[in-house]
A protein has these predicted regions:
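Short hydrophobic/aromatic-rich motifs at helix boundaries and adjacent loops
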Residues: 103-104, 158-161, 191-193
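Carbohydrate-interacting regions of secretory-pathway proteins
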Residues: 1-157
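A metal-dependent hydrolase metal-coordination microenvironment
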Residues: 168-253
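Structural motif
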Residues: 4, 68, 126, 164-166, ...
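N-terminal low-complexity, Pro/Thr/Ser-rich intrinsically disordered segments
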Residues: 153-170
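Generic hydrophobic alpha-helical membrane-segment signal
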Residues: 78, 161-165, 240
Length: 254
Protein backbone atom coordinates (compact mmCIF):
# COMPACT_ATOMS: atom_id res chain seq x y z
CA UNK A 1 0.00 0.00 0.00
CA UNK A 2 2.95 2.34 0.48
CA UNK A 3 4.47 2.48 -3.01
CA UNK A 4 1.65 4.64 -4.38
CA UNK A 5 1.81 3.24 -7.91
CA UNK A 6 -1.08 0.81 -8.11
CA UNK A 7 -2.62 0.52 -11.58
CA UNK A 8 -4.38 -2.83 -12.09
CA UNK A 9 -5.57 -4.44 -8.88
CA UNK A 10 -8.24 -6.07 -6.75
CA UNK A 11 -8.89 -4.10 -3.55
CA UNK A 12 -11.06 -5.72 -0.88
CA UNK A 13 -12.06 -4.22 2.45
CA UNK A 14 -14.69 -4.63 5.14
CA UNK A 15 -16.46 -1.45 6.22
CA UNK A 16 -19.09 -0.24 8.62
CA UNK A 17 -20.60 3.23 8.97
CA UNK A 18 -21.99 4.55 12.22
CA UNK A 19 -25.00 6.91 11.93
CA UNK A 20 -24.02 9.90 9.81
CA UNK A 21 -20.77 8.33 8.65
CA UNK A 22 -19.95 8.75 4.97
CA UNK A 23 -17.03 9.33 2.65
CA UNK A 24 -15.21 7.50 -0.12
CA UNK A 25 -12.47 5.07 -1.10
CA UNK A 26 -10.08 6.69 -3.60
CA UNK A 27 -7.80 4.96 -6.08
CA UNK A 28 -5.32 6.11 -8.74
CA UNK A 29 -5.01 9.18 -6.56
CA UNK A 30 -2.29 11.20 -4.82
CA UNK A 31 -1.79 12.17 -1.15
CA UNK A 32 -3.95 15.27 -1.70
CA UNK A 33 -6.81 13.40 -3.40
CA UNK A 34 -6.54 15.67 -6.43
CA UNK A 35 -6.92 12.98 -9.09
CA UNK A 36 -8.36 9.56 -9.70
CA UNK A 37 -11.70 7.95 -8.93
CA UNK A 38 -13.63 7.51 -5.70
CA UNK A 39 -16.18 4.95 -4.58
CA UNK A 40 -18.84 6.35 -2.27
CA UNK A 41 -19.43 5.11 1.26
CA UNK A 42 -22.88 6.27 2.39
CA UNK A 43 -25.62 4.18 3.99
CA UNK A 44 -27.63 7.10 5.42
CA UNK A 45 -31.06 6.65 3.85
CA UNK A 46 -32.12 10.09 5.07
CA UNK A 47 -29.19 11.88 3.39
CA UNK A 48 -30.28 14.79 1.21
CA UNK A 49 -27.73 13.65 -1.40
CA UNK A 50 -29.52 10.35 -1.93
CA UNK A 51 -28.07 9.62 -5.38
CA UNK A 52 -24.47 8.90 -4.25
CA UNK A 53 -24.93 5.85 -2.08
CA UNK A 54 -22.46 3.11 -1.18
CA UNK A 55 -20.74 1.64 -4.23
CA UNK A 56 -21.21 4.67 -6.47
CA UNK A 57 -18.36 5.45 -8.86
CA UNK A 58 -18.87 9.10 -8.00
CA UNK A 59 -20.08 11.34 -10.85
CA UNK A 60 -19.72 8.49 -13.34
CA UNK A 61 -22.08 5.79 -12.03
CA UNK A 62 -23.98 7.29 -9.10
CA UNK A 63 -26.21 4.81 -7.26
CA UNK A 64 -29.52 5.84 -5.73
CA UNK A 65 -29.84 2.91 -3.33
CA UNK A 66 -27.60 1.15 -0.86
CA UNK A 67 -28.79 -2.22 0.33
CA UNK A 68 -26.41 -1.92 3.27
CA UNK A 69 -27.60 -0.30 6.50
CA UNK A 70 -25.72 1.86 8.97
CA UNK A 71 -24.01 -0.07 11.80
CA UNK A 72 -23.77 -3.11 9.50
CA UNK A 73 -20.45 -4.59 8.34
CA UNK A 74 -20.20 -5.11 4.58
CA UNK A 75 -17.57 -6.10 2.06
CA UNK A 76 -16.51 -3.82 -0.79
CA UNK A 77 -14.52 -5.15 -3.73
CA UNK A 78 -12.99 -2.72 -6.23
CA UNK A 79 -11.36 -4.19 -9.32
CA UNK A 80 -9.46 -2.08 -11.84
CA UNK A 81 -8.17 -3.92 -14.90
CA UNK A 82 -7.14 -1.92 -17.95
CA UNK A 83 -10.04 0.40 -18.78
CA UNK A 84 -12.61 -1.41 -16.66
CA UNK A 85 -13.73 -0.58 -13.12
CA UNK A 86 -15.94 -3.07 -11.28
CA UNK A 87 -17.44 -2.61 -7.82
CA UNK A 88 -19.10 -5.36 -5.79
CA UNK A 89 -20.91 -4.94 -2.48
CA UNK A 90 -21.28 -8.14 -0.44
CA UNK A 91 -20.50 -10.10 -3.60
CA UNK A 92 -23.15 -8.37 -5.72
CA UNK A 93 -22.00 -6.29 -8.72
CA UNK A 94 -23.16 -2.67 -8.54
CA UNK A 95 -20.81 -0.92 -11.00
CA UNK A 96 -19.36 -2.17 -14.29
CA UNK A 97 -17.77 0.77 -16.06
CA UNK A 98 -15.37 0.93 -18.99
CA UNK A 99 -13.59 4.24 -19.46
CA UNK A 100 -13.64 5.00 -23.21
CA UNK A 101 -10.85 6.53 -25.25
CA UNK A 102 -12.56 9.93 -25.02
CA UNK A 103 -14.34 10.09 -21.64
CA UNK A 104 -16.76 12.94 -20.98
CA UNK A 105 -15.77 15.01 -17.95
CA UNK A 106 -16.89 18.39 -16.64
CA UNK A 107 -14.32 20.89 -15.40
CA UNK A 108 -14.94 19.78 -11.81
CA UNK A 109 -14.10 16.18 -12.75
CA UNK A 110 -11.23 16.81 -15.17
CA UNK A 111 -8.85 14.56 -13.26
CA UNK A 112 -11.33 11.75 -12.56
CA UNK A 113 -9.50 9.41 -14.92
CA UNK A 114 -7.58 6.16 -14.89
CA UNK A 115 -3.82 6.41 -14.47
CA UNK A 116 -2.03 4.91 -11.46
CA UNK A 117 -1.49 6.00 -7.89
CA UNK A 118 -2.16 5.36 -4.26
CA UNK A 119 -5.32 4.61 -2.29
CA UNK A 120 -7.09 6.96 0.07
CA UNK A 121 -9.96 6.89 2.55
CA UNK A 122 -11.99 10.07 2.88
CA UNK A 123 -14.44 10.70 5.72
CA UNK A 124 -16.67 13.76 5.45
CA UNK A 125 -19.73 12.86 7.51
CA UNK A 126 -20.75 13.37 11.12
CA UNK A 127 -20.26 9.70 12.02
CA UNK A 128 -17.48 7.16 11.62
CA UNK A 129 -16.25 4.92 8.82
CA UNK A 130 -14.76 1.77 10.34
CA UNK A 131 -12.48 -0.42 8.20
CA UNK A 132 -10.78 -3.79 8.60
CA UNK A 133 -9.36 -6.66 6.53
CA UNK A 134 -7.81 -4.60 3.71
CA UNK A 135 -6.19 -6.66 0.95
CA UNK A 136 -4.74 -5.68 -2.43
CA UNK A 137 -3.78 -8.06 -5.21
CA UNK A 138 -1.98 -6.74 -8.29
CA UNK A 139 -3.33 -7.83 -11.69
CA UNK A 140 -0.85 -8.67 -14.45
CA UNK A 141 -1.50 -6.16 -17.25
CA UNK A 142 -0.49 -8.70 -19.89
CA UNK A 143 -3.67 -10.67 -19.09
CA UNK A 144 -5.95 -7.71 -19.96
CA UNK A 145 -7.40 -7.22 -23.47
CA UNK A 146 -7.80 -3.44 -23.48
CA UNK A 147 -8.89 -3.31 -27.12
CA UNK A 148 -11.76 -5.66 -26.36
CA UNK A 149 -12.75 -3.48 -23.41
CA UNK A 150 -12.75 -0.31 -25.50
CA UNK A 151 -14.94 -2.01 -28.09
CA UNK A 152 -17.60 -2.39 -25.37
CA UNK A 153 -17.28 1.15 -23.98
CA UNK A 154 -20.00 3.77 -24.39
CA UNK A 155 -19.46 6.79 -26.64
CA UNK A 156 -19.54 9.32 -23.81
CA UNK A 157 -19.26 12.36 -26.05
CA UNK A 158 -22.76 11.49 -27.30
CA UNK A 159 -24.12 9.93 -24.11
CA UNK A 160 -26.63 12.11 -22.26
CA UNK A 161 -26.61 9.84 -19.19
CA UNK A 162 -22.94 10.39 -18.33
CA UNK A 163 -23.51 14.12 -18.76
CA UNK A 164 -26.24 14.00 -16.10
CA UNK A 165 -24.00 12.06 -13.71
CA UNK A 166 -21.18 14.54 -14.30
CA UNK A 167 -23.59 17.41 -13.56
CA UNK A 168 -24.53 15.80 -10.22
CA UNK A 169 -28.09 15.17 -11.42
CA UNK A 170 -29.89 12.03 -10.15
CA UNK A 171 -30.44 9.49 -12.95
CA UNK A 172 -33.40 7.26 -12.13
CA UNK A 173 -36.22 5.49 -13.97
CA UNK A 174 -39.08 5.45 -11.46
CA UNK A 175 -41.29 2.94 -13.27
CA UNK A 176 -39.83 -0.46 -14.18
CA UNK A 177 -41.70 -3.78 -14.06
CA UNK A 178 -40.12 -7.22 -14.18
CA UNK A 179 -42.05 -8.81 -17.03
CA UNK A 180 -41.59 -9.93 -20.61
CA UNK A 181 -38.27 -11.62 -19.87
CA UNK A 182 -36.89 -8.73 -17.82
CA UNK A 183 -35.57 -10.40 -14.67
CA UNK A 184 -33.92 -8.64 -11.75
CA UNK A 185 -30.55 -9.91 -13.00
CA UNK A 186 -31.12 -8.59 -16.53
CA UNK A 187 -32.40 -5.26 -15.18
CA UNK A 188 -29.41 -4.90 -12.86
CA UNK A 189 -26.92 -5.64 -15.66
CA UNK A 190 -28.69 -3.19 -17.96
CA UNK A 191 -28.58 -0.56 -15.22
CA UNK A 192 -24.86 -1.08 -14.69
CA UNK A 193 -24.22 -0.78 -18.44
CA UNK A 194 -26.28 2.36 -19.07
CA UNK A 195 -25.84 4.14 -15.74
CA UNK A 196 -29.61 4.50 -15.27
CA UNK A 197 -30.83 3.54 -11.79
CA UNK A 198 -34.13 1.68 -11.57
CA UNK A 199 -37.14 1.66 -9.31
CA UNK A 200 -38.72 -1.79 -9.52
CA UNK A 201 -42.45 -1.65 -8.81
CA UNK A 202 -44.50 -4.87 -8.62
CA UNK A 203 -48.25 -4.83 -9.23
CA UNK A 204 -49.93 -5.43 -5.87
CA UNK A 205 -53.63 -6.02 -5.32
CA UNK A 206 -56.51 -8.43 -5.80
CA UNK A 207 -56.07 -10.27 -9.10
CA UNK A 208 -52.43 -9.22 -9.47
CA UNK A 209 -49.18 -11.14 -8.86
CA UNK A 210 -48.85 -9.99 -5.23
CA UNK A 211 -52.01 -10.22 -3.15
CA UNK A 212 -51.01 -10.45 0.54
CA UNK A 213 -48.44 -9.41 3.13
CA UNK A 214 -46.44 -12.64 2.97
CA UNK A 215 -46.02 -12.37 -0.79
CA UNK A 216 -44.83 -8.79 -0.34
CA UNK A 217 -42.17 -9.83 2.18
CA UNK A 218 -41.05 -12.77 0.03
CA UNK A 219 -40.68 -10.41 -2.93
CA UNK A 220 -38.78 -7.75 -0.96
CA UNK A 221 -36.41 -10.28 0.60
CA UNK A 222 -35.59 -11.59 -2.88
CA UNK A 223 -34.97 -8.10 -4.26
CA UNK A 224 -32.89 -6.63 -1.45
CA UNK A 225 -29.65 -8.03 -2.83
CA UNK A 226 -29.83 -5.53 -5.71
CA UNK A 227 -29.41 -1.72 -5.55
CA UNK A 228 -32.94 -1.00 -6.76
CA UNK A 229 -35.34 1.44 -5.16
CA UNK A 230 -38.34 -0.75 -4.36
CA UNK A 231 -41.71 0.82 -5.01
CA UNK A 232 -45.21 -0.63 -4.88
CA UNK A 233 -47.73 -0.13 -7.65
CA UNK A 234 -51.02 -0.37 -5.78
CA UNK A 235 -53.85 -1.75 -7.91
CA UNK A 236 -57.59 -1.35 -7.38
CA UNK A 237 -59.38 0.30 -4.50
CA UNK A 238 -58.91 -2.54 -2.05
CA UNK A 239 -55.13 -2.32 -1.66
CA UNK A 240 -55.47 -0.09 1.41
CA UNK A 241 -57.10 -2.94 3.33
CA UNK A 242 -55.42 -5.83 1.46
CA UNK A 243 -51.98 -4.96 2.84
CA UNK A 244 -51.13 -3.98 6.40
CA UNK A 245 -49.65 -0.53 7.16
CA UNK A 246 -46.55 -2.24 8.55
CA UNK A 247 -46.00 -4.10 5.28
CA UNK A 248 -46.56 -1.00 3.15
CA UNK A 249 -43.80 0.76 5.11
CA UNK A 250 -41.33 -1.87 3.89
CA UNK A 251 -41.46 -0.31 0.41
CA UNK A 252 -39.42 2.78 -0.39
CA UNK A 253 -42.61 4.37 -1.67
CA UNK A 254 -46.17 3.48 -2.77
Amino acid sequence: LKNGKYKNFDLTLDLRTTPGGKGAVWFHTDPNLKKGYRIAINNDRADKVWWKMTGSLVSVRNLTKSFVKEDQWFKMDIRVAGQEIDVNINGEPVVEYIQPTAPYRTDANTYALLSEGTFGIESDGSGEIQIKNITVNVIDESTIDINAQLAEANDEQNDEIIKLHQSDFPVLDYHVHLKGGLTKEVAAKQSRKTGINYTIAPNCGIGFPITNDQQVMDYLNEMRSQPFILGMQAEGREWITTFSPETLKEFDYV
